[in-house]
Amino acid sequence: GLVGSEMCIRDRIDAINAQARKAFPDLEFREAYTSRIIIRRLKTRGVVKNTPLDALLQLRGEGYTHIIVQSTNIIDGVEMESLRRDVESVLPFFKEIRVGTPLLYSVEDAEKVTDILGQRLNASVQQSAKKKGKEHFVLVGHGTYTPGTATYSQMDYMLKVAGFGNFHVGTIEGYPTFETMLAQLKAAKAKSVTLVPFMFVAGDHAKNDIAGEWREMLEKEGYTVHVRMEGLGQIPEIQKIFVDHIRFGLKHRT
């Protein structure tokens, strides 16, 4: 099953589902959402979505014995912990349940994402009108209060090591903070900044916090600010990493 947590922009979720179905034509797929707020919102529009627990119990009722649960989370944070708890609660009902890893789990995952985003975003500037000075990109993640927040700092570090010195990572609710990221922009003498959601879907969170608050705060500091409303789930190479995690989960016990 594929698990989504942000306000669903349907085609983003559908795109990764399509990639997964194509890669594993013999598997039965179910979709679930970890956010009860999103589930409630969708219900008011007549769209019914299960929580992971509901989806698992439904599969049990249909007689399935071997399950792999793949999340679309970016880091191994609170939502992954909650998902694993749900899985543990129904373990006795199945012969086996495996849980696939989030996007950024291994060093190799982070290196791949660094390369994908670095190349893609730098290329997006080269295609547009040639600007004076270098465009700086700020990847904005949700953030978390668990040790998983270190993943964001790792991404910031890896981007710079890979030669993408014009990339900086910040989080809305964790570390690196807005202030930490701002200090980096100042040190780099940046003038023009593009904000990019470091989230699977660029939903309400991204619109309010990134296109709203962060943009305003940076403009107050004197920066020219652009916003690129593209969630990670839109990028085919990122979708492929999630599909690879399913493949790994099918081959190895996790």
State the predicted function of each range.
Residues 2-8:
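Short, small-residue-biased leader/transition segments that mark boundaries at the very start
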Residues 10-68, 76-194, 199-204, 212-254:
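Non-catalytic structural scaffold of enzyme domains
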Residues 73:
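Phosphate-coordination/substrate-recognition cap region in phosphate-metabolizing enzymes
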